[in-house]
């Protein structure tokens, strides 16, 4: 049998051409400690920070601490079946979540797995949960408004697309309601919403999902939930999963609103993991990198420049305060990262002012440039008027003999507070907000009894819908006030039909 060199060389060439390289990582370690959502493993000398690791029972973990002799791992799932001495294997991958249109209308966990019982999610796209935030030259300044439908926010602390606006307040002051109402108001705004519930009760998340479904908002919303019963690693990862899903839409030129409800619970989960992993505690026992925990998350919210499609992520992070103390560690951290804050005060909430927004401590650092011209015109002096009223109100308690000008200011202030009240799940379109604020500023409400102000607003909106829809349409399309004479005439005409009720 003769061997021909040409045949051998052609066979070798063929095999080289058909060769497919596959990265196979076969490092195997041994679990030396397991408990409370974390594990330690020996023998994974080449593991990378943030790498996914697989335990022998199929549960995944993520390498967090790379030490001399072992690796600290956070476990992404039930850890009760893992035993000391079990094998743990490197995968060579980093943590990714599914992304894309198929997620809209679904409720998923921190790993992107469906938890709503509606079957698997048909999507092939994935994104890593950790990503570099857009750089300076990839962004543009905030210039488009995000209409929340809440008068007190759109007038006093306007939010723009691509902004990060902190919502801060004690528990039970209506923080979640503000976010849900904002999501409901995005129905016709070409906006995708992602609601990330961190450490909430299952029943609370269920109520939020049902509210969104009832109002048709699930058609453009993804809910990411890491409930209070879940292990701490899933609470820690939930916000990153939410923003990874949002980035897919942003880089495709779409606008996304992400609500993180709330980051205090994420910080507490991260503190728990860090202490279990024996990292040195700092102030309030939080680890030294708790600022970076939130800054790297919130910096991923941006308004991209036009060459990248002009998409945006607007972030509404929540932080819970204790007894209104906004100078605690986590609140001050997040205030310094965000572009403004909306402070909800329990005193106002319990006195019936809802949403309970404290106009003095709330601020929007970049939203003003995104506010529409009509709203800027009517709401220009509103914040100062409100601050002056609060000051006068405290003085007026001490003396009854007030001069006419002071009395007039107090009366106007009462009506301003009343106008800014709003019912739950009833967001208001911006043109109707402009209308009632115009009526307030131009003294149409001065002789309307305070208890009738909200009825006046409701009847005025209905009357304008039927008799002067063209004025509302003009505000909506031009974003400017219509001809003043026409608007004044219409308001006077309505005012003549309004019948004040008897004093209560």
UniProtKB/Swiss-Prot annotation:
Its main location: membrane. It catalyses: ATP + H2O + 4 H(+)(in) = ADP + phosphate + 5 H(+)(out). This is ATP synthase subunit alpha 2. It comes from Listeria monocytogenes serotype 4b (strain F2365). The gene is atpA2. Pfam families: ATP-synt_ab, ATP-synt_ab_C, ATP-synt_ab_N. Belongs to the ATPase alpha/beta chains family. The keyword Disulfide bond does not apply. The keyword Nucleotide-binding applies. F-type ATPases have 2 components, CF(1) - the catalytic core - and CF(0) - the membrane proton channel. CF(1) has five subunits: alpha(3), beta(3), gamma(1), delta(1), epsilon(1). CF(0) has three main subunits: a(1), b(2) and c(9-12). The alpha and beta chains form an alternating ring which encloses part of the gamma chain. CF(1) is attached to CF(0) by a central stalk formed by the gamma and epsilon chains, while a peripheral stalk is formed by the delta and b chains. The record marks 362 as: Required for activity. It is a peripheral membrane protein. It comes from the Bacteria. Keywords: ATP synthesis, ATP-binding, Cell membrane, CF(1), Hydrogen ion transport, Ion transport, Membrane, Nucleotide-binding, Translocase, Transport.
């Amino acid at each position: 049998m003769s061997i021909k060199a040409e045949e051998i060389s052609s066979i070798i060439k063929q095999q080289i051409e058909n060769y497919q390289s596959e990265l196979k990582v076969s490092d195997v370690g041994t679990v030396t400690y397991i408990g409370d959502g974390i594990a330690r493993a020996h023998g994974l000398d080449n593991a990378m920070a943030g790498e996914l690791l697989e335990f022998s029972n199929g549960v995944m973990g993520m390498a967090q601490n790379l030490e001399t002799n072992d690796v600290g791992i956070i476990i992404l799932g039930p850890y009760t079946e893992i035993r000391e001495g079990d094998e743990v294997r490197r995968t060579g991958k980093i943590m990714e979540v599914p992304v894309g249109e198929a997620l809209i209308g679904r409720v998923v966990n921190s790993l992107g797995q469906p938890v709503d019982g509606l079957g698997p999610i048909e999507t092939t796209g994935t994104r890593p949960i950790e990503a570099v935030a857009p750089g300076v030259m990839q962004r543009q300044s905030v210039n488009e408004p995000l209409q929340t439908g809440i008068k007190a926010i759109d007038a006093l602390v306007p939010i723009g697309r691509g902004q990060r606006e902190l919502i801060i307040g004690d528990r039970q002051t209506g923080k979640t309601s503000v976010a849900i109402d904002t999501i409901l108001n995005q129905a016709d705004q070409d906006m995708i919403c992602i609601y990330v519930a961190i450490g909430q009760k299952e029943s609370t998340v269920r109520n939020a999902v049902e509210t969104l479904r009832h109002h048709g908002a699930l058609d453009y919303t993804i809910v990411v939930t890491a409930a209070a019963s879940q292990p701490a690693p899933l609470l820690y990862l939930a916000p990153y999963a939410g923003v990874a899903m949002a980035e897919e839409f942003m880089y495709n030129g779409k606008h996304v609103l992400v609500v993180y409800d709330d980051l205090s619970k994420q910080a507490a989960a991260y503190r728990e993991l860090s202490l279990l992993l024996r990292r040195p505690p700092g102030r309030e026992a939080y680890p030294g990198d708790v600022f970076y925990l939130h800054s790297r998350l919130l910096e991923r919210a941006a308004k991209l420049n036009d060459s990248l499609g002009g998409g945006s992520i607007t972030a509404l992070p929540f932080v819970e305060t204790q007894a209104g103390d906004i100078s605690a560690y986590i609140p001050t951290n997040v205030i310094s990262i965000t572009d403004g804050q909306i402070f909800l005060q329990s005193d106002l909430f319990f006195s019936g002012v809802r949403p309970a927004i404290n106009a003095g401590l709330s601020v929007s650092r970049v939203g003003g440039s995104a506010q529409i011209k009509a709203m800027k015109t009517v709401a220009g002096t509103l914040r100062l008027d409100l601050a002056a009223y609060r000051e006068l109100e405290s003085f007026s308690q001490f003396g009854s003999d007030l001069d006419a000008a002071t009395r007039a200011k107090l009366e106007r202030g009462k009506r301003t507070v009343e106008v800014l009240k709003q019912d739950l799940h009833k967001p208001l379109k911006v043109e109707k907000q402009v209308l009632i604020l115009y009526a307030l500023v131009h003294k149409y409400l001065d002789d309307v009894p305070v208890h009738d102000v909200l009825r006046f607003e409701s009847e005025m909106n209905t009357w304008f819908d039927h008799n002067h829809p063209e004025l509302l349409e003009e505000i909506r399309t031009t974003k400017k006030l219509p001809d003043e004479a026409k608007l004044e005439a219409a308001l006077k005409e309505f005012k003549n039909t309004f019948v004040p009720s008897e004093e209560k």
